[in-house]
Amino acid sequence: MSALNKLFGDERKRDLESNVAALFSQSSGPVDTLEVKSKPRTLLPVVSKRQETETAKPAEPTEIVEADLPRKRAKKAKKTNEDDDHLEEKYMQQVLKEDSDHESEAEAPTEPVVELKPSKRASRPDMKEEELAKAERTVFVGNVPHEAITDKKVYKEFKQLVAQRKLSKEDEDDEEQKAEKYAVESIRFRSIAFEEALPRKVAFVQQKLHHTRDSVNAYVVYAEKEAVTAACKLNGSVFHDHHLRFDSVAHPAPHDRKRSVFVGNLDFEESEESLWKHFMSCGPIEYVRIVRDPKTNVGKGFAYVQFADLVSVNKALLLNDKKMAVGKGRKLRVTRCRNMQKVQRQSNTAALPKLTDQQKTKLGRARKVLGKADRATLGKLTIEGTRATKGANTPNLRVKKARSKTGRVTKRSQAFKKAEANKKQK
């Protein structure tokens, strides 16, 4: 073969050359750039990573997949059947849970957040509510004999008189049964006249009473409000030759000018008992009131007498310009009472804080019922928790001034005490 190849050449080489020649003979010539640009661009399909991984995994045998499918379907069907069995129970539990959540939200509403500020002391106007409640249980007793403040025996008798027994239907039927009496909290005596211008406590301890004034006034405070009505029925009763006048402090009896007479030209030292006896012949008397000076408790020379009916007034007018059979024996001037308009005091409401309608009502009532000391602090602001301070006394009251520490009297007393101490040492 090698010899033949050398003579005639290699066949493979000849075939290759012929093929190459045939390839270039079929060429279409040079490339046209315009034709290339006009051809559409070929786009390759995008392959995702998931497809790449799936293609990269070896294909599982179809027999195994076909064998696992019935098992999975059976498990899924069994699971759905179990879910269907417990579906109603789960639904009811969900409904109950939602109802309980709604109830808890309704019971405990969300409260708005409040910013806490530093606390301050509470302040409110002093309406004297305790004193007003005490006035509802207080009775005024006039023309009380002055022995009630000097003699303990007379005082006990007076206390037994005002402490009445409680009347009821059972007590009226059974007289042997002893009924309970109204409890008396306190008895205060006022309108006491003294002979010398001393402090009231000193003059009372020394018993320097005015010799011409034989009566005083008293305020009886009961433990129950019902006792006031029963005590007012004792009006006009006689106690140690004195006609007592009982009246409520909170709800006093109104002054009826048509049943009253004005008595003038009285002696300054005249007593209520002498007027009571003088007008007793005219008819039943409700009360006798002599107007007195608040500082000295001595009469101003005129009085008012109120009767129980209108007929007694005409009889009393016949005693005009006639001398009194008892007492000082002066001629009296008896006339009808005039309809005098009361001068209303201007209340200084500008200095008071802003009050409600209810507080204004209490303020006006307290001014008529309470005394001078309580009226001075009425309506003023009181700060809870504060204590009384020295010098914060009630205005318009008599206050004894403290003795000077550097005055002449103090120096003389100190020198006298030193001299007495030196004498004792010697």
Swiss-Prot record:
It comes from the Eukaryota. InterPro entries: Nucleotide-bd_a/b_plait_sf, RBD_domain_sf, RRM2_Nop12p-like, RRM_dom. Keywords: Nucleus, Repeat, Ribosome biogenesis, RNA-binding, rRNA processing. One of its GO terms (biological process) is maturation of LSU-rRNA from tricistronic rRNA transcript (SSU-rRNA, 5.8S rRNA, LSU-rRNA). Its main location: nucleus. One of its GO terms (molecular function) is rRNA binding. Pfam families: RRM_1. The keyword rRNA processing applies. Residues 137-251, 259-339 form the RRM domain. Residues 26-128, 401-426 are annotated as: Disordered. CDD domains: RRM2_Nop12p_like. Residues 87-105, 417-426 have a biased composition (Basic and acidic residues). It is found in: Nucleus, Nucleolus. Residues 401-415 have a biased composition (Basic residues). Coiled coil: none annotated. The keyword Metal-binding does not apply. GO terms for cellular component: nucleolus; preribosome. Involved in pre-25S rRNA processing. Belongs to the RRM RBM34 family. PANTHER family: EUKARYOTIC TRANSLATION INITIATION FACTOR 4B/4H (PTHR23236), RNA-BINDING PROTEIN 34 (PTHR23236:SF25). This is Nucleolar protein 12. The gene is NOP12.
